[in-house]
Amino acid sequence: MNKGNGKFNFWQKWLTYANLMTIAVGLLVAFAGNSFFFEIHNNYTKDVFLNGNEFDQNILELKNWLFGIIGGTIVGFHILMVMISENSFKKKEKWAYKTMWYGLLTWFIIDSGISIYYGAIHNVIIINLVALVLIGIPLIMTKNEFKN
């Protein structure tokens, strides 16, 4: 294995593990959205949408339902990312590289844009930027492998 392949392999594995970690976060979103894992996010959400008041029972049920389907979507999206990373991306197929960027950036722009529109900047900072950096770094670091 030459040095270039070692570098590529490192970043490809980072990409896989970052997405596996995000799958775990998606499961937490779906099944533990009111736990200490999301206390900061939930507190900021209350500040933005409820003037700092607690969720009443109806709002809490709506939030739990939304977190459930959002968590499921996160899990499904990142399972696809892992499968692409471990197969076509690893084989340096250009479509895989482009697809990962398209999926990541489409999610980031839509999710962050809506969050900003509604004043939920905390979602962009706490969740979206972390995921963008965590998954974007290995994509940036491997771009030269997909030039042909």
Task: Please describe what each predicted stretch is.
Residues F37-N42, Q57-V75:
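A loop-to-helix transmembrane entry motif
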Residues F108-I127:
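Membrane-helix boundary connector in multi-pass membrane proteins
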Residues M81-G103:
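Cytoplasmic juxtamembrane regions at transmembrane-helix boundaries
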Residues A18-L28, T73-M83, G103-I110, V130-I137:
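Membrane-embedded alpha-helical transmembrane segments of multi-pass integral membrane proteins
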Residues T45-N58:
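Luminal/periplasmic active-site loops of membrane-embedded glycosylation enzymes
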Residues L132-N148:
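Membrane-water interface at the C-terminal end of transmembrane alpha helices
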Residues Q12-F38:
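N-terminal signal-anchor transmembrane alpha helix
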Residues M1-K7:
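Short, Lys/Arg-rich, polar N-terminal cytosolic tail immediately upstream
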